[in-house]
Amino acid sequence: MQCPYCDHEDTKVIDSRLSEAKDAIRRRRECLACGKRFTTYERREPLRLMVLKRDGRREPFDREKLRAGLEKACAKQRVTGEQIDLIVDQIEAELRERRRHEVTSRRIGDMVLARLRRLDMVAYLRFASVYRQYTDVDQFRSELLRLAGSGMSKGG
């Protein structure tokens, strides 16, 4: 494994364990040249799944695109990279278990919102505003009132 700091080819594995979602092996490595440590993940082959978009287009499922959307929603919030990774891992595992070749972007969005709602309300609202295509303040207000009515207005 090549060191991301000095590009040296020789590294050693210090620790190896199963990820929280149990779909990857997390390895802590140390470069034998510069001594710096870094983490790698070993995952099974990517999920071969098509996402049906709102406009009728189909595109391959992309966990990195999902992760990027979560990172934007969670920016400057108390949500760690590990928590974002766990959400992505959980959603990918749930989609894999369905054993279907196609899923709607709406279904994926609903899965994300369900998890963000339990994690961070500001991130939830940010994601919902894009996913549900809010165009004015009244739509935000309605969502906030709905959340407050369900006792879920705390977070962030």
Curated annotation (Swiss-Prot):
Needed cofactors: Zn(2+)
Residues making up the signal peptide according to the UniProt record: none
**Which Gene Ontology BP terms does the record give?**
negative regulation of DNA-templated transcription
Give all residue intervals belonging to the ATP-cone domain: 49-139
Q: How many cofactors are bound and how?
A: Binds 1 zinc ion.
Instruction: Indicate yes or no for the key word ATP-binding.
Output: yes
User: This protein's superkingdom?
Assistant: Bacteria
Query: Where do the ZnF regions (unnamed) fall?
Result: 3-34
| Gene Ontology molecular functions | ATP binding; DNA binding; zinc ion binding
Swiss-Prot/TrEMBL keywords:
ATP-binding, DNA-binding, Metal-binding, Nucleotide-binding, Repressor, Transcription, Transcription regulation, Zinc, Zinc-finger
What's the stated role of this polypeptide? Negatively regulates transcription of bacterial ribonucleotide reductase nrd genes and operons by binding to NrdR-boxes.
Q: Which family does it belong to?
A: Belongs to the NrdR family.
Name the chain's protein.
Transcriptional repressor NrdR
Task: Tell me what gene encodes this.
Answer: nrdR
